């Protein structure tokens, strides 16, 4: 096992990465190794997808499957080894079908890629794990060095984050052939184990640019189906009655659950990254969507254990449900998996609803505590002139985007301390689950404009980018000249691709933490600092002083 893709990876003087019987996320060595094997199979599939496009062949089954299966290897998504192998087998079957399509056009068609003809050696998980050793990401570290390995992983993990957003967009009916062609090209190239530093740096920027387009179609999918988010108050306390908790990012799953629970007497609560759903008109119209429960994903083993109903996980992040003994009432959807946990194959939430009706639910309603969400792209753009006016009258000094992933490290208190230290004449724009570090605190307003503005999920970084570009255009300056600073927390691969997106758009002087990715070498960090001004957090006082004086 070797895995260094998330922020909580093991770090020692000898090197970074989880390489024991189990990773810090709870992923076993078996599952981790089989995920490496799956990725190799997906690289072979993408190699043939690239070849097929040369013949004008676009196989939508391949396009739909490839990012979804890649998403299953993202941190805290799928811990179920047999299902990972199932994805690998499906990848190979689709590859062979695609190969046959190519051969039907050109009998001499061939694909010059090391992964293009990969076959699984056995049905036995142990033998497959031994085969997977051929594809361990750091297998040639001694030959290529840490810097090349780090850049490879930056590209691989960044592309994995983009694949997750591609799947979210696909679920909402969004498809862009150019995006999929670019995805397959990059995925296939990474399967050649590239070792050119400049080419890898260029690839990382290409992934970032591609992801901007992915976030654009995801935004279109969400707003077309569910309307544009508008500011909405959400109760974060319990309401009396039977209940279901839904976590993750998939708004379609939430919509289906709300439709199926309507009139049943079962209330629905959002958790984690599902919180922004309350801002969408077509979701909040369901009166039994009563509130948001819990805090950051890392606290779920305590909070889920206390929740008096079933829980549905639609995407990341799931952690071991046996710790809180709620594994008999947690359900996984789509690419999510945990051994022994009930999995919903389709869109029928009937079994979950039936379980909710058999459980006690909340015995009484707590005193409401309301927070505000729903500052989506349209709302943000509608406030652009107000922001400019406040800046021109020196009522608004600075905007801080403080957001990103949450996690368990104590150092993440930095982001709470930073938010609460932001001066009263400054605004905090937030997104993703890092907001749970401070989103239930009171920040007041500036002439009626809330000082804490929740823009949505991690992918809603797109809205923040569009706002920044709009402000820069109206003020006749560059984005980097705005009174705007980005203070980002990272944990997994979606955060990595958001960072690449920002860097590829030329955004500079981003501050990130609580620690640098384990695959960032000192040399790589130095390059990113020199080129983009990217740096790690220090202390709240020092960072605040530096950002306000920039």
From Swiss-Prot:
It is an enzyme of class 1 (oxidoreductase). Its main location: cytoplasm. GO terms for cellular component: cytoplasm. Its EC number is 1.7.99.1. Its cofactor is [2Fe-2S] cluster; hybrid [4Fe-2O-2S] cluster. Binds 1 [2Fe-2S] cluster. Binds 1 hybrid [4Fe-2O-2S] cluster. One of its GO terms (molecular function) is hydroxylamine reductase activity. Hybrid [4Fe-2O-2S] cluster binds at residues 249, 273, 317, 405, 433, 458, 492, 494. Disulfide bonds: none annotated. Catalyzes the reduction of hydroxylamine to form NH(3) and H(2)O. This is Hydroxylamine reductase. It comes from Salmonella enteritidis PT4 (strain P125109). The gene is hcp.
């Amino acid at each position: 096992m070797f895995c260094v893709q998330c922020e909580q990876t093991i770090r020692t003087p000898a090197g970074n990465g989880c390489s024991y019987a189990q990773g810090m996320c709870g992923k076993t060595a078996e599952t981790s190794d089989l995920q490496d094997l799956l990725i190799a199979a997906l690289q072979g599939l993408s190699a043939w997808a690239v070849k097929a496009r040369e013949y004008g062949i676009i196989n939508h089954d391949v396009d739909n499957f490839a990012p979804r299966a890649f998403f299953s290897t993202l941190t805290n998504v799928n811990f179920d080894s047999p299902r990972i192998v199932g994805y690998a087998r499906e990848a190979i079957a689709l590859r062979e079908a695609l190969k046959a399509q190519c051969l039907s056009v050109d009998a001499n068609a061939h694909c010059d890629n090391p992964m293009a003809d990969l076959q699984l050696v056995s049905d036995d998980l142990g033998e497959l794990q031994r085969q997977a050793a051929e594809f361990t990401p750091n297998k040639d570290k001694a030959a290529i060095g840490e810097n090349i390995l780090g850049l490879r992983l930056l590209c691989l993990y960044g592309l994995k984050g983009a694949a997750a957003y591609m799947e979210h967009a696909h679920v909402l009916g969004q498809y862009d052939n150019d995006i999929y062609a670019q995805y397959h090209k990059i995925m296939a190239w990474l399967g050649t184990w590239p070792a050119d530093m400049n080419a890898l740096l260029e690839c990382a920027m290409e992934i970032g640019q591609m992801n901007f387009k992915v976030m654009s179609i995801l935004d279109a999918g969400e707003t077309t189906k569910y309307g544009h988010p508008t500011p909405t108050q959400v109760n974060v306390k319990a309401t009396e009655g039977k209940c279901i908790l839904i976590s993750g990012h998939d708004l379609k799953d939430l919509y289906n659950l709300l439709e199926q629970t309507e009139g049943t007497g079962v209330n629905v609560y959002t958790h984690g990254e599902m919180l922004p759903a309350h801002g969408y008109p077509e979701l909040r119209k369901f009166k039994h969507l009563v509130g948001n429960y819990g805090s950051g994903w890392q606290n779920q083993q305590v909070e889920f254990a206390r929740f008096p109903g079933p829980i549905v996980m639609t995407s990341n992040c799931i952690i071991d449900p046996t710790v809180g003994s709620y594994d008999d009432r947690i359900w996984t959807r789509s690419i999510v998996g945990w051994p022994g946990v009930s999995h919903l194959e389709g869109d029928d939430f009937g079994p979950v609803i039936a379980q909710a009706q058999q459980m006690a639910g909340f015995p009484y309603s707590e005193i409401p505590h309301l927070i505000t969400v729903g500052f989506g792209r349209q709302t943000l753009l509608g406030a652009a002139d107000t922001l400019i006016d406040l800046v021109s009258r020196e009522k608004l000094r600075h905007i801080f985007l403080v957001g990103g992933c949450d996690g368990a490290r104590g150092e993440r208190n930095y982001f709470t301390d930073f938010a609460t230290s932001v001066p009263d004449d400054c605004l905090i724009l937030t997104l993703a689950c890092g907001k749970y570090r401070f989103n239930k605190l009171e920040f007041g307003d500036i002439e009626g404009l809330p000082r804490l503005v929740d823009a949505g999920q991690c992918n809603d970084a797109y809205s923040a980018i569009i706002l920044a570009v709009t402000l820069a255009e109206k003020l006749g300056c560059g984005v980097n000249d705005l009174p705007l600073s980005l203070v980002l927390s990272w944990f997994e691969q979606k955060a990595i691709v958001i960072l690449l997106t920002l860097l590829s758009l030329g955004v500079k002087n981003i501050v990130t933490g609580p620690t640098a990715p384990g695959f960032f070498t000192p040399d790589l960090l130095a390059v990113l600092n020199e080129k983009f001004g990217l740096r790690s957090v220090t202390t709240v006082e020092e960072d605040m002083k530096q950002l306000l004086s920039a």
